[in-house]
Amino acid sequence: MAAISPANATTAASLSLPQFSSTSSSLSSSSSPSFLNFKTASVSNRCIKCGVRSLENHSGHRSLDFLSNGDPISLINPNSSSPITMAAATSESGSKSSKRVCLFHSDETRDLAERIVAKSDCIELRSINWKKFDDGFPNLFIQNAQGIRGQHVAFLASFSSPAVIFEQLSVIYALPKLFVSSFTLVLPFFPTGTSERMEDEGDVATAFTLARILSNIPTSRGGPTSLVTFDIHALQERFYFGDTILPCFESGIPLLKSRLQSLPDSDNISIAFPDDGAWKRFHKQLQHYPTIVCNKVRMGDKRIVRIKEGDAEGRHVVIVDDLVQSGGTLIECQKVLAAHGAAKISAYVTHGIFPRSSWKRFKLDTKGDPAEGLSYFWITDSCGMTVKEVMNKPPFEVLSLAGSIASALQV
């Protein structure tokens, strides 16, 4: 600590001491520290104790924390291990760790992209012109392409049908070549995930084909492309991707857990898995709930669902799976659980595909009969077309992946 007495005021002034106003004393009672900049001034006979908050230069001035009136003036140089210095360093490093991301999107994912941007000030929405030539092939234009040089760039894709995959792949392959700092592909639903089996000679595993295509996305200046996807169908599919892409596998289960905790009967919930595959995938994330496991058995030409283990009697049973298409398995599981005494039945899937509007098969339980309807059917917004169809149609509720994606873009 270096003390400066009033006798050395002239010398102190040459060191650019702060000039305090008559209201300086009120600053000491503020809950947050006040910052004063050094400037050449005469100290006169006034003695004030100050503490140096930071020794960094800001536009030629040094910043202080005002401490108190006192005698004499003291300039305190905090060492690197002091709490104030460490807190300042932590705050500065925290702000520097948040990266700004330019987010592009397909036509189908505009609504989800806007929700993602609303979740983070560090994500900026960018646009692409999606047009077609007269022959039907895509006519694409990335707006302000030079403006994304050196930026972190992400693309929110939706491979909802083979018709849109080619035009989006064209953009996905082009963006990393625009001198971007890094490139992240967000594909909430990996669409060919159910096509990974080769049971007969001649079967084509299209899941592996798409994984190979994505593995060959050009590298950006920062290195390989990052891929963010949610609840991919078969666990072994994570090994389909090559070494030139960095897959980040996320899950929608945390959204479900948060929603279940908000229910009035949250202490009476059991989780049912429609088959062993769903149990292997999700049981560790939901292990604090009582578990019911169903399976399919063949009876002649039919396959029926039975309860393998667990008790549904008097419980609010939530059927959990990664995706639903026609919904036949879920409906059979619902009937079996109701027959075993479930008080309520709800369902959750991360990806509600529902081809040919099969979502209409699921009705709301309005009479207290779980065999006839569901209390809730939760899906995420990974499939944008489905969300538009089921929005505000009970028993469906949409749990948005926007917050999870915004967090993943900061990895």
UniProtKB/Swiss-Prot annotation:
KW Nucleotide-binding (keyword) present: yes
Gene Ontology biological-process annotations: nucleotide biosynthetic process
EC identifiers of the protein: 2.7.6.1
Name recorded for this polypeptide: Ribose-phosphate pyrophosphokinase 3, chloroplastic
Statement: the UniProt record of this protein carries the keyword Transport: no
CDD domains: PRTases_typeI
Family: Belongs to the ribose-phosphate pyrophosphokinase family.
Catalytic activity: D-ribose 5-phosphate + ATP = 5-phospho-alpha-D-ribose 1-diphosphate + AMP + H(+)
Domain of life, per lineage: Eukaryota
Keyword annotations of the record: ATP-binding, Chloroplast, Kinase, Magnesium, Metal-binding, Nucleotide biosynthesis, Nucleotide-binding, Plastid, Transferase, Transit peptide
Location relative to the cell: Plastid, Chloroplast
Chain residues that bind Mg(2+): 231, 233
Transit peptide endpoints, chain numbering: 1-39
Region (Binding of phosphoribosylpyrophosphate) location: 314-329
Native source species: Arabidopsis thaliana
GO cellular component, one term: chloroplast
Principal cellular location given in the protein's record: plastid
SUPFAM superfamilies named among the record's database cross-references: PRTase-like
InterPro entries: Pribosyltran_N (IPR029099), PRibTrfase_dom (IPR000836), PRTase-like (IPR029057), Rib-P_diPkinase (IPR005946)
GO molecular function terms noted in the UniProt entry: ATP binding; kinase activity; magnesium ion binding; ribose phosphate diphosphokinase activity
A Pfam family this chain is assigned to: Pribosyltran
